[in-house]
Each structure stands twice: as structure tokens, then as C-alpha cells.
Amino acid sequence: MTFDAIDQMAVSTIRSLSIEAIQAANSGHPGLPMGAAPMAYVLWNHVMNVNPKTSRNWTNRDRFVLSAGHGSALLYSLLHLSGYDVSMDDLKNFRQWGSKTPGHPEVDHTDGVEATSGPLGQGIANAVGMAMAEAHLAAKFNKPGFDIVDHYTYALHGDGCLMEGVSQEAASLAGHLKLGKLVLLYDSNDISLDGPTSMAFTEDVKAKFEAYGWQHILVKDGNDLEAIAKAIEEAKAETDKPSIIEVKTIIGYGAEGQGTSAVHGAPIGQDGIDHAKGVYGYDAPAFTVPDEVARRFEAGIKFRGEAAENAWQTKFAEYEAAYPELAAEYKVAFANEPVHVDLNAHELGSAVASRVSSQQAIQQISEQVPSFWGGSADLSASNNTMVKAESDFQADNYAGRNIWFGVREFAMAAAMNGIALHGGTRVYGGTFFVFSNYLLPAVRMAALQNLPVTYVMTHDSVAVGEDGPTHEPIEQLASVRSMPNLNVIRPADGNETNAAWKRALAETERPTMLVLTRQNLPVLDGTAENAEAGVNKGAYIISEAKGDLDGIIIATGSEVKLALDTQAALEAEGVHVRVVSMPSQNLFDEQDAAYKEEVLPAAVTKRLAIEAGTSFGWGKYVGLAGKTLTIDTWGASAPGDRIFKEYGFTVENASQLYKSL
């Protein structure tokens, strides 16, 4: 691959558009775009197979993740030059209200952006997930002569991404899985926001990644287009290992303060722009693209991508004729439509932990939904997430549907985001609920990106018992419930668990977190008939008062049974209360005023909420006149039933609390 003066001009155009957008906004990060523009240009205009005309609709396109999302001006410049729906006016409106060019890339907001990025390191894990999805779908759908799924995943990152723990978890997993179609481009400039990386980051990146099972390739000069192209070709030629291409760059190349942290995160000023353009030998007016550069992109990424997709569409038509059932399944998998399943009801009189009823649901879902796969962060035996009839997803069996994420909660959740962003599958992942704290940054990104992933969180309360307070969730429910666009469902029995899974699979634009018990839960009267509608509405009357309504007991999960027993005890004393099962506060909050009034009449102020977690957040449901039977301290090490008793989760105490209202 050879390059000429027009290619160099194209690199200068990318650099200039980026720093001009940042200057117009008087906000942004010029250092990365100025330093990394050459590698980004080579990748985009000479290597990647994407079709700007169809954008993310072509399923076999290459994927690109800007893990160092603060360098978004670089990406927007590339998108504009490549023919995506990012205009010059959009570049001029960088970081402004309502613009297509926000401070960090946002998927489904800006045409051509594959992943929302910014929190450092997560983009690497997203890319690992995308590569996992590509490998899985290729093993599933490809046939001799028909490589329907055959593309690469690229991510551009900096030193900061490698300092984050999530990138190390993800890199370890990718090396184990031998994801040969994953290529990282490492903007290695030895500078972080605070100063030289020598202050805090002195490890041997090459040795570390080789120990992970990666190929490491070094490009000594980040402005050497030929060397960069050769390195990418070498990375693509290695099929049994992921590759990291370390490109030694100068942060803020061309600026007076190049090579220092001063150019990392602030505009360089108009004088600085003029100086940089002088270094580049580039005199095009601000926010313009030389005709030669425009033609080079027309002949590069635009022509190559359109030709590649046209060839793929022709091949897929032949594939569809030869393998109609597989082709139909492929189309359904990428449609991102609500998934509907039938699950066996749980009969009154039986009792299983909701993690076990979830396991039973997972087995049934896997039989009905071929795109369904997932796993656990080394807790499959406890989370009950493995599909017994399916094989494992490993380097020698990418068709497997059981994913072993290892003890890597954060990377698991971030990789799940990448899997969902890639499309073609419905993914789930599990761990203990107390460890949800380890993965919350990735859950937040899933909610922000409207990704329909499912989290299987088990061991949901102090009923964990003997393991003690380190493993007993207290504040977690309040924490995850506070997150926008996240379904949180804590089912009371097997039928509510079935309904929770059905709701999760019906979602197409938000993640769902299932919060499940370790201990057995009896099947409750009426849930076989009412749980599905009740869960979908977030709360429902599971047992009505037997006489004139005195008050309401609201409960979730394992405490619904306690609420029902308390209701019976109060009835025996002539006190008539309603019991409301509230598996999902957020779904209840979305109901209309009439339904909320039906379940929780405003005139009924005597309310008691029962939940084995913090009281935080319950005030909006019980009101100032109500009370809670909750836990606002840490758990303890003892059998779970003893802990419940010590913390007052008994019929006697609940009855007294209600009567004190």
C-alpha cells in the first residue's frame, strides 16, 4: 500500500477540521485528533469495509469503536469526509445543544457511530464483545463458499484506556478466546491529562499483551502512513490472536505545546491553529475540504464500502437460495424486534428459588430463541445461567452459547454492550447482586445506549446468610433503581420470574436487571394467572382486603410472602389490608394515573413497605404517614432465616409495625 501527497493532505484536513471544530466550541480535546489522525485515516480510507450510504444497516460491515471518546472531533471529521450524515455545519456546531456532534460519541445520535464512548477503557471491552459476536455468528451461519459473517472490529484507544481495569479484564478474555478479528490501535503518546505517563504508567505493554495471548505490533513513527498500513495488514493476517498495534504518536502534533499535557483537553486558540497548519503545510480555509481530498475519500472508503456491500448482498441472495431457513433466522436475529416466548407456569404448592425458576426459564428460552446466549462471571453454578443442552463458547467452538466470562464482572457487562451493539443475538450475564457495583459503569452505558441486555443478579438480600455482610446486598436495589432507562425487576415467585424474563425479552431499547433469590420461594396464589400483567405494570394487587380497606402493605421479591402472612394475621384481628406486589418500581412509575390510583389509592395513607434492603426510595410509595420494614445497616454472618428474624422480618413485627401507623 503506497501513499502520496494527497493522502498527507487528507491527514492535514482531518487534523484541521478537528481543531477548528474544537475552537468553534471553545471546548474539546485537540491532542488526540492531532496525534492520531494518520492512523485513523489509513484505517478508514484504506482498510475498513463500511458503506456510509447504508451506515449501520449493513450487518457485515467492519466495526470501529473510539474508546478514547474524548477525541470525538477526530471521529466526526472522519464521518463527514467519509460521506455519513455529518455535515460541515454539524462540525461547526460541535458540543452545542441539539447538535449531531456531542462532546463524546453517541450511538443512534450521530450517523456512523457504532458505540457511545467516553468512560475510558469501556470501548476496548465493547470491541471485545463485538468480536465475540462476530465469531459466534460466523460459526453459526457461515457455510462453505458463503462467509456471510466475515468482518473485523477495530478500536482506537490511548494510554488512559489501558490504565483502566476494565480494559485489562477484557484483553485477558479476548486473548483466551483468540479473537483474531479484533485489532486495537493504540495511540501511544506517553501523555495523560495530568502529565507524562511516567508519573503513573510505566509497565511493559508489549510483554503484558503478549502474556494475554495477543500479537503486539510497534509502529515507531505515528506519521508514517506506510508503516501504519503494513501493521494493520500484519494484524489482519494473524487469525489466532487479537492484535494491538502500538503507534508512537506526538500528542497535539503541530501545536506549539505538542508532546505535553497542555494540548490534551483545551482549545489551542486561533494562533495555535494557524501555527499547526503552518507545520502541516496546509492552507485550506477553515471548515473546508480540498477537492483532491474529497475525491480521495470518494475513491477510498465510499467506493470500497459500496462495492463490498453490493458483493455481500449478491452473495447473501445466493445463500438465501441455498439455505433459506438459516437466511431467515439471520434476518430475524438482526431485526431487534421484541422476542416472545412461552414458559411453563409454576404450580401452587411448589417452592423454588427465583434463581432456579430463572434457570428453568433460560433453558426454555434457549430452545425457542436461537439467538439467545450468555453466561456468568464465574458463578454459573450459583447464578444458574448455563444452558444444559448447549456447548461452551470457546476458541475451538465459537458456535457455543454458554459464555464463560471469568471473574470479570465489569468486562462482562461492557462486552455484553458490545455484543448487543453488534446485533444478531440477545445476550445475558450473571453474578451475585452484591457485585453489581463492579459492573454499574457498564450498566449505565447500556441504559444510555438503549441496549436490550439482561442481567441475572442472584443472592439478592441478607438471606444469603453465612457468607456475611460482604456478600449481602443492602443499598444495591436503591442504586440500580435510580438509573434512568433500566428495568429492575425483583420477582416474588416462579411465575413472576417467568413474567420478568418475558418482559426482558420484549424490550428492544433498554436493559433489564433481574434480582433473584438464593432461598426457595413458594408459588403464590394467583400469580399463574396475574403475574405477567402485574409485572408488566410494575405492581399489582396480589391479595385484596377481605373487608373495608384499612391500609396497604407493599412488598417485593421474597418479602411478598411475608406480606401475605402478615395480611392473614391482621385479618384474624379484624384489620383488613391489601397486599401489593411491586416487582418493578420503574415499570409502575410508567403507568397512567388511573392505574396507580387503582393500586395505591391516594386516600389510603396507612401503608407499610416490606423489603430486605435499604429504605431509600420507598418514601414516594408509603408517604409521610407510612412506614417501612427495611434494612438500613449491614448484614451479618448466620443462617439466612436467623438473620431475617433478627432484623425483624417476622409476621409479629410486621403486624406491630402496621398497627402502629
Sequence positions of predicted segments:
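A short glycine/serine-rich beta->alpha loop
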Residues: 4, 21-30, 59-67, 109-121, ...
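Non-catalytic terminal/interface segments that mediate subunit docking, oligomerization
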Residues: 310, 314-452, 530-541, 547-548, ...
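Cofactor-binding active-site loop characterized by glycine-rich and histidine/acidic residues
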Residues: 36-177, 386-387, 419, 527
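Buried hydrophobic positions in well-ordered alpha/beta secondary-structure cores of metabolic enzymes
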Residues: 18, 29, 39, 75, ...
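N-terminal capping segment at the start of a domain
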Residues: 11-27, 187-189
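Terminal amphipathic helices with adjacent charged low-complexity linkers/tails
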Residues: 59-60, 243-338, 586
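Thiamine diphosphate
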Residues: 96-108, 132, 136-150, 167-288, ...
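A short, small-residue-rich loop immediately preceding and capping a beta-strand
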Residues: 25, 62-63, 113-116, 146-164, ...
